[in-house]
Swiss-Prot record:
Residues 83-105, 141-160 have a biased composition (Polar residues). Residues 1-6 are periplasmic. Keywords: Cell cycle, Cell division, Cell inner membrane, Cell membrane, Membrane, Transmembrane, Transmembrane helix. This is Cell division protein ZipA. Residues 28-352 are cytoplasmic. Residues 78-120, 138-160 are annotated as: Disordered. One of its GO terms (biological process) is FtsZ-dependent cytokinesis. The gene is zipA.
């Protein structure tokens, strides 16, 4: 048993040593080689030692030299190949001339003369001279033309002279068209117009004052419809408000809802809706907490527009509200709505 433990201990030590050796070897293998160990190190050293005849290496860097004060550097003069660029290359074919070759070589080159300074002369066209003078004269130079006064162009005389020179009729030049003289606008008497306007305004104001003023007529009758919650139930404000808005009711005067002639909530009031419980008002900001036993719709007679049409709208609105809230429609006496009640309301409408 002890021999087995010793063998295992030796094998384990050998395995650990092998792993360590392999690790060091792999780490050393992965490290980059330095320039000294690179196979190209000798080549770079030889290239650095090589220099040309002037003492410069492959990169154009010379040796470091120390100069003494007063020492003059010797300049190296390189031979330069000079060529005569003025000579033209000889062509492949040569021309035979009567003069011998030596004479042609002895002849001096063409003498270069400086160009003479020529004064520019300004020459006027011949056609222009026909319009200016009677006879055709030579064009003056620039110096004389600056001093001589210019003649004014006369279309009548120049046209006749042009016909005499050319022998052909020349079309007459169109004369400039003068704009028609507009008659002066008559002066407007502003004061008179202002007085006339004032007089018209005064007449209209007097007519309005004489016209009878439509005083508000006192109502002679009121048509009432009740919407009452069923037994054991209440009308919730959160359900009532959307129904009223869908029927174009608008919250307004006396803190109640009104139905106007315009669906946008403007114009005359056709009928109104109030709370059945006192004080009969609504709070639109707290409609979610609002509860009531019922609401009442009422329309005064006489009213604006056709009373029969207005009552029809009110009756249809009452039917819709009762259907939306699951409530009952009652008449003014809080009795169920019936055909007899409807006939009675129509009679009251006709009497109004």
């Amino acid at each position: 048993m002890k021999d087995l433990q010793l063998v295992l201990f030796v094998l384990g030590a050998i395995a650990i040593i092998a792993v360590l050796v392999h690790g060091f070897w792999s780490i050393r293998k992965q490290q980059p080689k330095s320039m000294k160990q690179s196979p190209m190190a000798g080549f770079y050293k030889d290239q650095a030692k090589r220099r040309d005849s002037e003492g410069f290496d492959a990169d154009g860097i010379g040796q470091v030299r120390v100069r003494k004060p007063g020492e003059v550097e010797e300049t190296v003069i390189k031979p330069v190949l000079k060529t005569n660029l003025s000579q033209k290359p000889h062509s492949g074919t040569t021309k035979l001339t009567d003069t011998p070759l030596q004479d042609s070589l002895r002849q001096p080159g063409p003498h270069k003369t400086e160009p003479e300074h020529v004064e520019p002369k300004v020459v006027q066209p011949a056609q222009q001279s026909l319009f200016v003078g009677d006879d055709v004269k030579p064009a003056p130079t620039a110096s004389t033309s600056m001093n001589t006064p210019k003649k004014i162009f006369n279309p009548s005389t120049s046209t006749a002279k042009l016909e005499s020179y050319t022998g052909k009729p020349v079309a007459a030049r169109p004369e400039p068209i003068k704009p028609p003289i507009q008659p002066a606008a008559p002066k407007v008497d502003v004061k008179a117009e202002v007085e006339e306007v004032k007089a018209e305004v005064e007449v209209k104001s007097t007519l309005k004052a004489d016209a009878p003023v439509n005083e508000p007529v006192e109502p002679t009758d009121v048509l009432v419809l009740h919407i009452f919650a069923k037994a054991g139930e209440q009308i919730q404000g959160a359900e009532l408000l959307p129904s009223l808005l869908s029927l174009n009711f608008k919250f307004g005067d006396m803190d109640i809802f009104h139905r106007h002639i315009d669906n946008a909530g403007t114009g005359k009031v056709l009928f109104s809706l109030a709370n059945m419980l006192k004080p009969g008002i609504f709070d639109p900001d707290n409609m979610e907490q609002f509860v009531t036993q019922g609401v009442v719709l009422f329309m005064t007679l006489p009213g604006y527009g056709d009373p029969l049409m207005n009552f029809t709208i009110m009756l249809n609105s009452a039917y819709q509200i009762a259907e939306d809230l699951g409530a009952e429609l009652l008449d003014g006496q809080r009795q169920p709505w019936s055909d007899a009640t409807k006939k009675d309301y129509l009679r009251r409408l006709n009497a109004a």
